[in-house]
């Protein structure tokens, strides 16, 4: 069971009350099927789903459009469970979209199945995107999502993304 409840604010010194992490709606961790109501109470504007559509359908027993389409704008960025994104540039582009939405005052919710592994990886990469060093990004993520950074493959992706991100910044 995910720690810190089914939904929690991702807290750091920027974008206060704008970034949330969550379990998948209607999935195995949302046993009361109440997560969507919690999202509504927070006035979430956008959802970033990190699950492939096939995983979402299998675990939530509904299509994403059936759950999100009526209430939320959403972005699907599929990452296989316990795996990593395939492309650094796609990740960088999505992080920039997230950054732009937050700069425009939008409330964003990010989730995978349990809201831990892929969600923690994504949010730690976002902190790098914002200019945090890797040690602070890991520390902030672990403070917010206690069981994050336990997957060696995702840990290596974070290290490699950090190098990619720094190389891009040197070229600009």
Model regions and ranges:
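Cys-dependent protein tyrosine phosphatase-like superfamily
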Residues: 1-109, 121-172
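Conserved G/P- and acidic residue-centered "switch" motifs that form tight phosphate/ATP-binding loops
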Residues: 115
